[in-house]
């Protein structure tokens, strides 16, 4: 072993880093284990990559040896995490090496032939694509473009999502493609679009070091964004005047730092938000100059339903469901009158939060001297009125002018590593195109068709099936060929018993799942395709602060596993244009006759124009080698054409391999920290100060939106609220983290967190097994009354990482009618001893 000498200065740095690491859930000994990053000293090759897990976008240093990742540590050159990792990030080196890693395509067969009820049998890629192409062509003949679909991911790399969107929206001419970001970020997208006319946060992580107060709305940052939480903690502990307010339906680890901790009754966040706005108006703290110059007022459509099936009684009663996204102009006076009924006193009574705490919270926003950052995640977004929650928190920041400047920021935190970069920016949602364009807008479709070199009318003008609707259509037999990549929706989707699983096993359907491991979803499929993971391919993610980050391929995938990008592009070779486009469309561009979708979409003179010698020396690139050109650069530069000059500018391709990410818009080589603010955002006109240029009038919208009840509430038969969510040790459905021994042992199985008094009343003790049952299904779990999560009486919390306890058999598939995002935080259950 090579001797190392560490001087006093280095030792002090290590001690400081160890303290911060402990706050992130990482054992202090882990830091010393990964200190040596020079190849000469360690005989390892080190390179940078974006972390595979959450939307924080930490950069990590990855060590490889003999075609294997052997170590990782936080990247000290990264602005985001400054050398730190959370407990999941610390074990990144192990996520690719589970004992049951998939290495060959697997097709259900009986007696050598495909059989929906057969056993999984290894097959070649050719055989896998043959049966897959046959089933897709059958579905296209039977139902047209609506018969095929795809469910993708906020964990796709940017070019994987872009290639998938092209294949389905342009190739198969269907918008039936949606990412699992529909479950996590759709309400944030719709909220931004409604308020600002353009997507993604105005601020950045630099706001943390400039803020005087932090307000968390439905966000357990301590566990879900632990590295950002270390920065919030550092700010709070190093500046005595700084305050932290945390609002949630149950107490969790973020409450440990809270100066103002508030547990509110589910759904009453709507009431609280309006009450704060009313307080600002009543106490004369509206920033009148800002409001007059930069905002207009709207009254939103109400009684919009809950996104349930049309025959559901709640949908039948919803008078505004058909026009859920509509709004009409009102004046400031009309808005002030609307919120005047929402007093802090009534809010306290409605929510159960003590009045003095609500007053303290309202004053953080109202005091013009206090800079406030509002953070929120799934508590807001997974909500039947999630878009409204987003709009209402923007209202507060707009009324006070606390936006688009250092320390003043309403900030929706992203859950997945590229929910922003791939789902939102690339536009892999069923209604979107790149750079905030939508399929319903003819000008947007025309621009996309021009960049993609397609005949006019190629892209359909109606949104496709969104995530929840895909499950319903599969069940109903109206969506027959379906491809799932980089997600585990049978475990993650709501109401799994009634709405998700039936579609997978419908004999009329053919289900393909691309995954690295045999997940619950993969095991319910007809064909499993083995997938390359993380640094087994060249990649790019976009994080929550608009930061785009690249990494090189560092190792090869095992066996016959191939990247999702390779799968998409290789599969496209199986389709002649005549098999997927109507004759009248082909007639508009006759030179496509006889070509494959691969030729038209990916070997089109744009994507394939960069030769292999442009790949940086010393790095493998399996996808590019397979196709004969630098795939990633070609896809990226074509995609970047959508945003350049339109407020979504990306830097040249090579810049991202050199940098630890850049925050768009990147104009003349300079990234943007604060959008909409003159001097920071190059799109703001000189002399305007602030310009919300997403709308032609340059103004943001302030919405009058009421409290409306949840889709389902506790009653005598089902007396408890159920909320679901995550824990720091596991990522989403646990497909990766449960295969890391240290993370599995740290939290081996999901439990039912319950108030001790509720348990005592039911004659239950900690560790007893109970049935958590709703009107839709049940699971068994053990009671936890002394854990990190502390629900109030009448509410239980069950995390969803555990495939042996599929809590989404219990949840309700109600969605926000505007964003179409599922509410996983509120349904009614009963707790029974087993």
From Swiss-Prot:
Predicted to be exported by the Tat system. The position of the signal peptide cleavage has not been experimentally proven. Component of the periplasmic nitrate reductase NapAB complex composed of NapA and NapB. Catalytic subunit of the periplasmic nitrate reductase complex NapAB. Receives electrons from NapB and catalyzes the reduction of nitrate to nitrite. It comes from the Bacteria. This is Periplasmic nitrate reductase. The lineage of its organism: Bacteria, Pseudomonadati, Pseudomonadota, Alphaproteobacteria, Hyphomicrobiales. Residues 44-100 form the 4Fe-4S Mo/W bis-MGD-type domain. Binds 1 [4Fe-4S] cluster. Binds 1 molybdenum-bis(molybdopterin guanine dinucleotide) (Mo-bis-MGD) cofactor per subunit. Its cofactor is [4Fe-4S] cluster; Mo-bis(molybdopterin guanine dinucleotide). It is found in: Periplasm.
